[in-house]
Regions:
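Hydrophobic alpha-helical segments that form the core
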Residues: 4, 117, 122, 166-186, ...
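An amphipathic alpha-helix adjacent to DNA-recognition modules
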Residues: 21-29, 41-42, 53, 62-86, ...
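Hydrophobic alpha-helical connector segments
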Residues: 72, 86-117, 169-176, 220-224
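Amphipathic alpha-helical packing segments from all-alpha helical-bundle domains
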Residues: 82, 97-100, 133-159, 171-174, ...
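Amphipathic alpha-helical segments used for helix-helix packing
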Residues: 98, 113-134
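Amphipathic C-terminal alpha-helical segment
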Residues: 109-112, 156, 176-194, 206-216
Length: 232
């Protein structure tokens, strides 16, 4: 499976960005924020020019078309997601611990409203699920890569004897993925601030029912470590 890690977490050699590159990144930061709340279809050269108080011709120098702008915005959203969600989970050991870390960093990213409109990819998925074309294809590729990443860690947990042999790791990943998506929906639409705690409880319940004694020890040690970290 090609998971989210295939899109890279390593840092390139740091160099000072050119003025044009810096401007390009600043434009995309605003574009991502607009698209998260108003949708990628609501994002246009004109809408962005209005927000940035720039000329349309100036923006056309960076993006030749609306589709090009949308694809660049998706790539910026992917980069932010990697920084906010994927990279913080990577120091955790493969398997159950990393799966937990990935889910917690994802919940935290939604809860903290890193994007003005909530989870960028949840919104983009709902917007483009039935629309053919390059933008829809890229949304599907990126969201599937994240789900594949969760599936891979669940499979790794089973290989490490942390999950029961009868556990379906693909189903488990599907379930925990759905819990976070539901928390995002309940918070954004219903303003339900308890949705994240419910999602955490649901994830714990599913994991505890699927783990082996070895996996339960891993969960217990991790829970104790997190409590100590919070108390400091």
């Amino acid at each position: 499976m090609e998971n989210i890690l295939a899109f890279g977490t390593s840092r390139a050699v740091v160099r000072r960005p050119t003025r044009g590159e810096q401007t390009h990144q600043e434009i995309l930061q605003v574009a991502v924020d607009i698209a998260s709340a108003e949708g990628l279809e609501g994002l246009s050269i004109g809408r962005l020019a209005q927000e940035l108080k720039m000329s349309k011709s100036g923006l056309f120098a960076h993006f030749g078309s609306k589709e090009e702008l949308q694809l660049a915005t998706l790539d910026m959203a992917r980069s932010i997601f990697m920084t906010e969600v994927v990279e913080p989970a990577m120091p955790s050991e493969k398997g159950l611990l990393r799966l937990q870390a990935m889910l917690e960093s994802w919940l935290s990213y939604v809860e903290r409203s890193v994007f003005r409109g909530g989870c960028f990819f949840a919104a983009a998925s709902a917007e483009f699920d039935d629309r053919p074309g390059p933008v829809s294809d890229q949304v599907a590729t990126l969201t599937k890569a994240w789900l594949d990443g969760l599936e891979d860690e669940a499979c790794q947990a089973q290989a490490l004897s942390q999950l029961k042999a009868k556990c379906d790791p693909i189903l488990l990943a599907f379930q925990v993925h759905a819990f976070v998506q539901e928390a995002n929906w309940a918070y954004r639409l219903l303003r339900d601030k308890q949705s994240f705690n419910r999602a955490r409880a649901a994830i714990c319940q599913v994991l505890e029912s699927a783990v082996t004694p070895k996996g339960l020890r891993v969960l217990s040690v991790n829970a104790t470590a997190r409590k100590k970290a919070k108390s400091k």
